[in-house]
Amino acid sequence: LILVACLMMSCVHCKKDGYPVDWNNCMYDCGYDNAYCEKICKEKGGESGYCYFWKISCYCEGLPDNVEIKGYGRCRG
């Protein structure tokens, strides 16, 4: 029982959602192009992606835990 609880708490293949960023900490602008965002997200190992209307930036779902997403900090590009 303890082993099962430990396995459930440790996330071996965690997934997260968010705005992926490039090496300059900048989000990917998409101009309402869902296909472009889907491609970016799949290349980063995500399950799906789309162009988020309000930010006009790509939003990914199911990204691996090691992929950087937009947090704090300014775009340096």
From Swiss-Prot:
Homology family: Belongs to the long (4 C-C) scorpion toxin superfamily. Sodium channel inhibitor family. Alpha subfamily.
Main function: Binds voltage-independently at site-3 of voltage-gated sodium channels (Nav) and inhibits the inactivation of the activated channels, thereby blocking neuronal transmission.
Pfam families (alphabetical): Toxin_3 (PF00537)
GO cellular component entries: extracellular region
Domain LCN-type CS-alpha/beta: 16-76
Domain remark in the UniProt entry: Has the structural arrangement of an alpha-helix connected to antiparallel beta-sheets by disulfide bonds (CS-alpha/beta).
Keywords: Disulfide bond, Ion channel impairing toxin, Neurotoxin, Secreted, Signal, Toxin, Voltage-gated sodium channel impairing toxin
Tissues/organs with expression: Expressed by the venom gland.
SUPFAM superfamilies for this protein: Scorpion toxin-like
Compartment annotation: Secreted
Gene Ontology BP terms: defense response
Cleavable signal peptide: 1-7
Protein name: Neurotoxin LmNaTx21.1
Intrachain disulfide bonds: C26-C75, C30-C51, C37-C58, C41-C60
Gene3D superfamilies: Knottin, scorpion toxin-like
MF-aspect GO terms: sodium channel inhibitor activity; toxin activity
